[in-house]
UniProtKB/Swiss-Prot annotation:
Protein name: Succinate--CoA ligase [GDP-forming] subunit beta, mitochondrial
Cofactor mode of binding and number, as noted: Binds 1 Mg(2+) ion per subunit.
HAMAP family for this protein: Succ_CoA_beta, Succ_CoA_betaG_euk
NCBIfam families assigned to the protein according to its UniProt record, in alphabetical order: PRK00696.1, sucCoAbeta
Family named by the database record: Belongs to the succinate/malate CoA ligase beta subunit family. GTP-specific subunit beta subfamily.
Protein purpose: GTP-specific succinyl-CoA synthetase functions in the citric acid cycle (TCA), coupling the hydrolysis of succinyl-CoA to the synthesis of GTP and thus represents the only step of substrate-level phosphorylation in the TCA. The beta subunit provides nucleotide specificity of the enzyme and binds the substrate succinate, while the binding sites for coenzyme A and phosphate are found in the alpha subunit.
EC number: 6.2.1.4
Swiss-Prot/TrEMBL site (Important for substrate specificity) positions: E61, D131
Protein source organism: Caenorhabditis elegans
Residues the entry annotates as binding Mg(2+): N227, D241
PROSITE patterns: SUCCINYL_COA_LIG_3
Localization of this protein: Mitochondrion
UniProt GO MF annotations: ATP binding; GTP binding; magnesium ion binding; succinate-CoA ligase (GDP-forming) activity
Tagged with keyword Cytoplasm: no
Length: 415
């Protein structure tokens, strides 16, 4: 569940579902609209716009943040950057903040969640600094184990929650919420105490927690993550950094939120894949992967790396895949010029292996394939699928298990 709290953009049960992700400033706009406490902030596309908008700020600290969807901005690096700053810059000097804006806008930011090519920064958010006394972590998310919303809270905020879970799991508190009853006053007070708020701030924090939960329900979110939720030196509670995800199934009744959606940051192949209900994420390697199931896809990538290779992508075709979707999956993964081998790994439960085979053969015949292809098929109609492959006359390397498939894919790469 904590992995989900860190990144809910992974997927799907019965069919492919994509989650809408928002940039931080968009999440803060939603928080503000729903009565949650956020510090003053503005969004700008250039230095002049920033100066005009932040005139209302006091002479306090300025926090300049590059607005991209990827996490890890603070430790990120700009390609061709000259100032040595990352995607988050904090200063008390207005001139230094303006220089940081110049450094960020128009450059590509590389973080642990982007490819080596990075993501172009077109907007920055400038927030008014607050005097932080203490940082906590709070997330509301949909949890399969609980069949409903769960609040994940920790008094150790401002850091990677997965690191907290690994090193000090006793510092993480989970509170399931009955989606019919909603969050009770007792639950919000307990969570505030779990976060180690004291005195009158227990009530203040409890109200903020309740507002965040109500927001989560009102906007059909799959995740509302506040890291950090802070206590200030003058006794206030603020949502300083926010991340939200929304289920596409809610788009018809959340038109205002889904109007935020943009594909500018996405890999064109990712946008292309979405049209065919394919879950595609580009990576930096040269072995393209076509797999059914997110777990099997990740295991496939792990074994590729274990054998010394690097995956070029994550691609889950899902359980309801058609021949046309398989055709387009092959087309999309082979459109990456870095790809030197294709690995297809299918375990057919719901998926019909013959459907996969027909789609692959059709794609190779129409598109052509100039790199080795390794195929491992098991499950429903596997014998028919193997016959389809055999009769096609295509030069396809077969494997009996995943480990063998990964090893063959890596060994087939040009030396």
């Amino acid at each position: 569940m904590l992995r989900a709290a860190g990144n809910l953009s992974k997927s799907m049960m019965k069919s492919q579902r994509r989650f809408l992700n928002l940039q931080e400033f968009q999440s803060k706009e939603i928080l503000e609209k729903h009565g949650c406490s956020v510090q003053n902030f503005v969004v700008a596309s250039n230095r002049k716009e920033a100066e005009e908008k932040w005139m209302s700020f006091g002479d306090h600290e300025y926090v300049v943040k590059a607005q991209i969807l990827a996490g890890g901005r603070g430790k990120g690096k700009f390609i061709n950057g000259t100032k040595g700053i990352g995607g988050v810059f904090i200063t008390k000097e207005k001139d230094a903040a303006l220089e940081a804006i110049d450094e960020m806008i128009g450059k590509r930011l590389v973080t642990k969640q982007t490819t080596s090519e990075g993501v172009r920064v077109d907007k920055v958010m400038i927030a008014e600094g607050v005097d932080i006394k203490r940082e906590t972590y709070l997330a509301v998310l949909m949890d399969r184990e609980s069949n409903g919303p769960v609040v994940v809270a920790s008094p150790d905020g401002g850091m990677d929650i997965e690191a907290v879970a690994e090193k000090t799991p006793e510092r993480i508190f989970k509170t399931p919420i009955d989606i019919q009853m909603g969050m009770t006053e007792g639950q919000s007070l307990k969570i505030a105490k779990d976060l180690q708020f004291e005195g009158k701030l227990i009530g203040v924090a409890a109200q903020e927690i309740k507002r965040l939960y109500d927001l989560f329900i009102a906007v059909d979110a799959t995740q509302v993550e506040i890291n950090p939720l802070v206590e200030t030196a003058d006794g206030r509670v603020f949502c300083v950094d926010a991340k939200m995800n929304f289920d596409d199934s809610a788009a018809y009744r959340q038109k205002e939120i889904f109007a935020y959606e943009t594909f500018e940051e996405h890999d064109p192949r990712e946008v292309d894949a979405h049209q065919f209900n394919l879950n595609y994420i580009g990576m930096d390697g040269n072995i393209a992967c076509l797999v059914n199931g997110a777990g099997l896809a990740m295991a496939t990538m792990d074994l590729i790396k274990l054998h010394g290779g690097e995956p070029a992508n994550f691609l889950d075709v899902g359980g309801a895949v058609t021949e046309d979707a398989v055709f387009n999956a092959v087309r999309i993964i082979t459109s990456d010029p870095r790809v030197k081998c294709v690995l297809i790994n299918i375990f057919g439960g719901i998926v019909n292996c013959a459907t996969i085979a027909n789609g692959v053969v059709s794609a190779v015949n129409k598109i052509g394939l100039n790199v080795p292809m390794v195929v491992r098929l098991e499950g429903t109609n596997v014998d028919a699928a193997k016959q389809i492959m055999k009769k096609s006359g295509l030069k396809i390397l077969t494997a009996n298990n995943l480990d063998e498939a990964a090893a063959k894919a890596v060994s087939s790469l040009p030396k």
